[in-house]
């Protein structure tokens, strides 16, 4: 019998909705829920092992979010038509689900737990990541897994001053703010945001608006769990052996507090002292007493945390002696590596990032595939955290989820100030290698990334700095900490990262380890972060105030031209043969867009000019009124076909071959001859040419100048392929524009013509052997004897006639 699912719907401000359904699919999972937003559908499941995992002191939670291409009605690309490893988007969304739910499991719960969210259907309007977070919350709520939820998640946009809940893709592109807010009915537990220099008040207003919508989600999930949810498992409360902790404090409390004083000891020395104290305590315990050793480890860590929290909340003192709003010492250097396109070292306290920028072309952009199709990404920021940065030994493997998450945050912070692609067509890759770490390494990556991009000459709208804020809260008493170090991050209640310019916020990330925080605490934290951000920006401006005006000599230069869209095929050639030939001949990179925009990139200026000229020759179009040096490709009874541009033929009708009437085209022309022709008309792909018009113009010109030896005729620029040299394109390039061809001034001086024969010259007399000389020149025939290269024309040496003294006689001189 078909099961009847339980369905509940949330109605949001603005008319959008989110529906939850349970009891129909994946019923053997301990908890499952279907979440719908528009036509986007996500299935979320939750399962936990019955028995706790032995020998661990952490909660073994795994979260996986997957976007299958079938959700968008697509096949996976490539040879293997099956989804493979998770994409970056899937990993980041998995983290967005993990981070808010992890603190809400009861302390002491050690059963392996797995949450899986699968995108089953995806429309082109609604991002399913919101459904994934809400689905995970609903699946846990209706399961028997102990969970102190539910949570709700909404994305908030800001368009023309109005907050919008769960904006569509189109709305997000127009939004000043893109903020994911996750919380319980009581408070906010996670924030993930990108923004275009939003103010602190705009951010807080969006968060408060989002929390109002979250309360609606939590109410619906709670009602659903109450109606169809399973009975929760019982978890034995963690008992605190207070006498044991007090005894440990009395015995080593003072020594441990001294060892944790990083104002007195550097981080490495402090950690060594802390480890030494613990080792001495272990020596007092029998080696085979595992229970006692385990208990010592647990309470030793509790004592460390308690000492830290008491120092901050009661003594108003940080471990390194700084004031709550004080930033560690900063030193900065740019242009540190000779061959990179841009580089910077940003050091803040014991955290150091070496950040490099590499500029590339369209071919270097990241190609991404998802259910919505394929896309390109021109800006990438990759964050690396080698083990030596914290003095440890470990295998070097691929980037983990933490590294991907930190890189994405820094990337989002800098994306807001990048120039638009039409003004800056480069692909950009920023790599942050953390060389030292004691907290806030992702924020050091943002600062170093901004410096590195400016060192590379990327015209950023403004420099960006990032700062990490912390919170220690005991009851109503709390302290907000600026520029938190590693211990403050580990033992504190909040990790609040804020990045931005002098004008506003570009990225935000907040994780809360407690039940939630109030809007007032958030306002104070944002204001304190703003002051810290401005301080860091001042330090950065002391080193480099604006992007460099000159690119590195090793960076590629972009040259752009616009070609007709119907010429794209000619440029690419069959199987890419033509464009590959240009690349192989010049070493440049070429990117052709569907609009006809061609980007040529090379660090060698001469190679780029050569490639541009080759492209211009291949894609040039015939212009009415212009004269071209063409090659006869085929003869017919009614005329000749002349290639005036590569791949472009025009018809030279028999009536336009000469000024006099001819009976047979072969009397004047042969295949392979080069002739000067003028374009009379262009009708689609049909081009009408005239040689007669060129001859008339030349004769008139010579007559005006007094006939005879009127001096050498001016040369006409031409390309290697016979097309006019130089190209005209959007923006221009140093090769210059196409020279205008003056009427009556064709080029008679072509030395590199195929077959080593001269250009066909205009006639003053006839081509017949019996024709005598006329004014301005003899009537040499279509002779094959001499080259006829005298200034002003020169005789061709005919079959029976003779060339005039200064005339333009001579037909096909083929000497």
Curated annotation (Swiss-Prot):
Residues 700-815 are annotated as: Disordered. Mg(2+) binds at residues 489, 495. The keyword RNA-binding applies. It catalyses: RNA(n+1) + phosphate = RNA(n) + a ribonucleoside 5'-diphosphate. GO terms for biological process: mRNA catabolic process; RNA processing. Residues 735-745 have a biased composition (Acidic residues). Its EC number is 2.7.7.8. It is an enzyme of class 2 (transferase). Signal peptide: none annotated. This is Polyribonucleotide nucleotidyltransferase. The gene is pnp.
């Amino acid at each position: 019998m078909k099961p009847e699912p339980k369905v509940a719907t949330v109605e949001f401000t603005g008319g959008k909705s989110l529906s939850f359904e349970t009891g129909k699919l994946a019923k053997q999972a301990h908890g499952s829920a279907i979440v719908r937003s528009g036509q986007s559908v996500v299935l979320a499941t939750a399962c936990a092992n019955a028995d706790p995992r032995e020998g661990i002191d952490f909660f073994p939670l795994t979260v996986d979010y997957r976007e299958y291409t079938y959700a968008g009605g697509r096949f996976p690309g490539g040879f293997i038509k099956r989804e493979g490893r998770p994409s970056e988007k899937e990993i980041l969304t998995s983290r967005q689900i993990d981070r808010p739910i992890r603190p809400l499991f009861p302390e002491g719960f050690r059963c392996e737990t797995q949450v899986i969210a699968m995108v089953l259907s995806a429309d082109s309007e609604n991002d399913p990541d919101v459904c994934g977070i809400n689905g995970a919350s609903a699946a846990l709520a209706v399961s028997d897994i102990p969970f102190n939820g539910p949570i709700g998640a909404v994305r908030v946009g800001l368009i023309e001053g109005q907050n919008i809940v769960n904006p569509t893709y189109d709305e997000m592109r127009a939004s000043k703010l893109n903020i994911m807010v996750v919380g319980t009915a009581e408070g906010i537990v996670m924030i993930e945001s990108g923004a275009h220099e939003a103010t602190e008040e705009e951010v807080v207003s969006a968060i408060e608006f989002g929390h109002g919508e979250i309360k609606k989600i939590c109410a619906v999930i709670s009602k659903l769990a109450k109606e169809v949810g399973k009975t929760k498992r019982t978890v034995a409360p963690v008992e605190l052996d207070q006498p044991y902790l007090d005894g440990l404090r009395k015995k080593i409390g003072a020594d441990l507090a001294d060892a944790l004083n990083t104002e007195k000891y550097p981080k490495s020395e402090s950690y060594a002292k802390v480890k030494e104290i613990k080792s001495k305590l272990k020596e007092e315990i029998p080696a085979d007493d595992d229970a006692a050793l385990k208990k010592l480890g647990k309470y030793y860590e509790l004592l460390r945390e308690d000492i830290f929290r008491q120092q901050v909340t009661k003594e108003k003192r940080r471990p390194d002696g700084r004031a709550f709003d004080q930033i560690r010492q900063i030193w900065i250097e740019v242009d540190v590596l000779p061959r990179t396109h841009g580089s910077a070292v940003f050091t803040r306290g014991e955290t150091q990032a070496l950040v490099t920028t590499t500029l590339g072309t369209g071919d270097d952009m990241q190609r991404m595939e998802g259910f919505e199709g394929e896309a390109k990404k021109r800006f990438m920021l990759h964050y690396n955290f080698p083990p030596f940065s914290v003095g440890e030994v470990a295998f070097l493997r691929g980037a983990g989820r933490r590294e991907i998450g930190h890189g994405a945050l820094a990337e989002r912070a800098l994306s807001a100030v990048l120039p638009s692609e039409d003004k800056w067509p480069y692909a950009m890759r920023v790599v942050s290698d953390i060389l030292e770490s004691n907290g806030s390494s992702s924020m050091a990556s943002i600062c170093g990334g901004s410096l590195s991009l400016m060192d590379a000459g990327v015209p950023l709208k403004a420099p960006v700095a990032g700062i990490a804020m912390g919170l220690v809260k005991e009851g109503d008493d709390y302290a907000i900490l600026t520029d938190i170090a590693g211990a403050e991050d580990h033992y504190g209640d909040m990790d609040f990262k804020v990045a931005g310019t002098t004008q506003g916020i570009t990225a935000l990330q907040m994780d809360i380890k407690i039940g939630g925080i109030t809007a007032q605490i958030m306002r104070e934290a944002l204001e304190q972060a703003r002051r810290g951000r401005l301080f860091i920006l001042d330090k950065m401006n002391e080193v480099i105030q604006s992007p460099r005006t000159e690119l590195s000599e090793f960076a590629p230069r972009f040259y752009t031209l616009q070609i007709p869209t119907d010429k794209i095929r000619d440029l690419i050639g069959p199987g890419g043969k033509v464009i590959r030939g240009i690349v192989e001949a010049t070493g440049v990179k070429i990117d052709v867009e569907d609009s006809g925009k061609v980007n040529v990139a090379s660090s060698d200026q001469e190679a780029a000019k050569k490639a541009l000229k080759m492209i211009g020759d291949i894609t040039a179009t015939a212009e009415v009124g212009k004269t071209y040096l063409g090659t006869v490709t085929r003869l017919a009874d009614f005329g000749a076909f002349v290639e005036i541009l590569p791949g472009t033929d025009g018809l030279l009708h028999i009536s336009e071959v000469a000024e006099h009437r001819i009976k047979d085209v072969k009397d004047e022309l042969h295949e392979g001859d080069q002739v000067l022709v003028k374009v009379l008309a262009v009708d689609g792909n049909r081009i009408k040419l005239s040689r007669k018009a060129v001859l008339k113009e030349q004769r008139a010109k010579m007559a005006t100048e007094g006939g005879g030896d009127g001096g050498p005729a001016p040369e006409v620029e031409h390309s290697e392929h016979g097309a006019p040299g130089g190209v005209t394109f959007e923006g221009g390039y140093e090769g210059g524009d196409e020279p205008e061809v003056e009427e009556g001034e064709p080029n008679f001086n072509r030395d590199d013509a195929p077959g080593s024969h001269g250009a066909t010259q205009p006639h003053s007399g006839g081509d017949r052997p019996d024709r005598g000389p006329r004014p301005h020149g003899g009537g040499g025939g279509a002779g094959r004897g001499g080259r006829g290269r005298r200034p002003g024309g020169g005789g061709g040496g005919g079959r029976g006639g003779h060339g005039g003294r200064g005339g333009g006689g001579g037909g096909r001189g083929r000497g």
